[in-house]
Amino acid sequence: MTQIMYNYPAMLDHAGNMSACAGALQGVGIDIAAEQAALQACWGGDTGISYQAWQVQWNQATEEMVRAYHAMANTHQNNTLAMLTRDQAEAAKWGG
């Protein structure tokens, strides 16, 4: 039987990187919204109404994506910590 080895520091680092990426995605979404808000001033009539509806959808989708990515990062971190705690408890039983 082969022993499976986990690199917990690398796994926790990866979870941290995921959180950082979620923050970066949020920043990009804010930048895009700001650019498009500047364009909105030029749009009127049906185009302006369409823009407003589209912007609401865009903002909601961006928020959902960022929330989901944060949730994935938190789940990854929590599961890694749970695995680490369990491994340490098992090792303690064997004197390791």
From Swiss-Prot:
InterPro entries reported for this sequence: ESAT-6-like_sf, T7SS_ESAT-6-like
Leader sequence segment: none
Classification via SUPFAM superfamilies: EsxAB dimer-like
Major localization class: secreted
Subcellular location(s) of the protein: Secreted
Record key words, sorted: Secreted
Cellular component GO terms, alphabetical: extracellular region
Family: Belongs to the WXG100 family. ESAT-6 subfamily.
Protein name: ESAT-6-like protein EsxR
